[in-house]
Amino acid sequence: MTSDRSIQFFEKQFEEHVRTGACELNPFELVAIPYLKGRVLDYGCGMGNLAFAAAERGCDVLALDASPAAITHIQQRAAVAALPVHGVVADLRDYELNEDFDAVVCIGLLMFFDCPTAFRALSSLQARVREGGVAVVNVLVEGTTYLEMFDAKSHCLFSRSEMESRFAGWSVLHSEFSDFEAPADTKKVFATLIARKPGALHEAAV
């Protein structure tokens, strides 16, 4: 997340989730889970619900987020559950990754960056997917009218064709647009893309 406004918006949500014990996967995470295996990066992990679901399926997960409340929760939960989920507080605008992953997940994050930063971060994530590995990316796209959580000068609504264009040459395993109603007669329009990086032989996704 790129601005104080965005961080504060989600920090309050995460603190409420900790208080209530909310840990259900959202619809985008449910779509992603069957494609995850091996070493997984959850980039913008929030409360870590997807990270723990992946770990329970045998994955080893690096979970990064800008929210101290979320990462503290993840670290405590991982210790209690003895699961391989490693939570790290990180400024994801320019976080330098130093390893490759079998799967990279970035759900609901990149739209909180300005567009040049979002595109740069996406390229960095793509570069860290191993040959034959999978990327799962979910963003808000043009047509979204609910903007309450954004800094006015620091957000990015992707064009509807942006995702598939940036994954040209990859094998697209799943691609969809989803509309959700939002307050004050507004809406959120999401694009979700799951793609396999060309290269090494791989097992088919479950």
Tell me the role of every PLM-derived stretch.
Residues 1-37, 46-85, 89-96, 113-120, ...:
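Class I (Rossmann-like) S-adenosyl-L-methionine-dependent methyltransferase catalytic domain
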Residues 38, 102:
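Conserved acidic residues
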Residues 43:
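Conserved beta-strand/loop positions that form the S-adenosyl-L-methionine
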Residues 99:
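Active-site charged/polar residues at nucleotide-handling catalytic sites that mediate phosphoryl
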Residues 105:
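A conserved beta-strand element that flanks and buttresses the S-adenosyl-L-methionine
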Residues 108-109:
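Short catalytic micro-motifs in class I SAM-dependent methyltransferases
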